[in-house]
Amino acid sequence: MPLAATVEPLRAAAGQVLMQQGERAISFLLISSGSAEIRHVDRDGVESVGRASAGEIVGEIALLRGMPRIATVTTTEPLDGWIGDNDAFTLMVQIPEVMPRLVRTIRQRLAAFITPIPIQVRDGTDLLLRPVLPGDDERTVHGHIKFSSETLYRRFMTARAPTPALMHYLAEVDYVDHFVWVVTDGSDPVADARFVRDPNDPAVAEIAFTVADAYQGRGIGSFLIAALSVAARVDGVEKFSARMLSDNLPMRIIMDQYGAVWEREDVGVITTVIDVPRSRDLHLGRDMVSQIKRVARQVIEAVG
C-alpha cells in the first residue's frame, strides 16, 4: 500500500492542542503549512519549548520508541498537514534514507529541550554549557568565534582544515556512544569536548577538546574534562583514552592532573589512558556537579 493512502489531511486552528505529553502515541503529523509549539516538561518540572514548521514531522519520537509522548504540541497559527498512524509510520521509515534522518532529528530535537547550564570561567566571563545541537558545525565554521590553524592542527593533527563532512560528523552525535559538550558565548560555540566510545570496549572512550584562541588560558579545558567526566560516569564509561601531538602542552597539563602516563605512538604523537575522574576529584562545586549530572542524564536517557 502506498504511503499516501495511509495518511489523512488535517487542518487545525491556532491554539489547538494536537498532542499531549504523557498520552499514548497513536499518530504522527507531517506539517505542510503553519507552525506549532513543542513544549516539554522534565521530571524536575523544568519547561523547554521548541518549534516545528512546514516540512517537519512531529509525534514521531514516541511512535519510533513505543513510549508515551514526551511533549505537548500546540498550533501557534493555522496549520495544515497530514496525519498518519503506526501503519503509515512503518511505511514511511522503510523509504531509503528516511530512518537515519528521523533518528538524527529525534536525538537532536530531544537535546534541544535541555536547558543550558550557566558557567563562569577563571577570568569571570559568563558562558553556557550544553549538549551539541544541530547547526553547531555551521556556527563553528562561519560564526564570529575564530579557531586558528594552530588550534585546529593540535585538535585534528593535520595542517588541513577539517572538511565539511568531518564537521558534520562532529555535530551529529547519539549522546551515548558519542557525547559532546559545547561551551557557547550565548550564540556561537567557543569550545567543545567529546568522548567517543571504543566499539571493542564500551567501558573506554577517546576524548578530545577544542577551545577557540580568544578563550584559551581561562580554564575552559579543565572545566570541560570535569564536565565530560560527569557525563561519562552517567553513561557507564570507566576510562578515557587520549591521542594527541606531543607539543600540545595545555592538554597534557590537564590530563597530567588525573595521573596520565604517556606513551609514544608515532613521531610527535603520544597516547594515554586514565580512569574517568570521580566527582570528588573534580574541581567543581557540588551544585555544578549536580547540574551537569542532571543534564547529562536527561540527554543520555531521552536521546540515546
Provide a role label for each language-model segment.
Residues 58, 74, 198-199, 208-217, ...:
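A short, internal acetyl-CoA/4′-phosphopantetheine-binding micro-motif in the GNAT/acyltransferase core
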Residues 100-102, 107-125, 131, 243-304:
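Terminal substrate-recognition subdomain of acyl/acetyltransferases
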Residues 232-245:
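Conserved GNAT acetyl-CoA-binding A-motif
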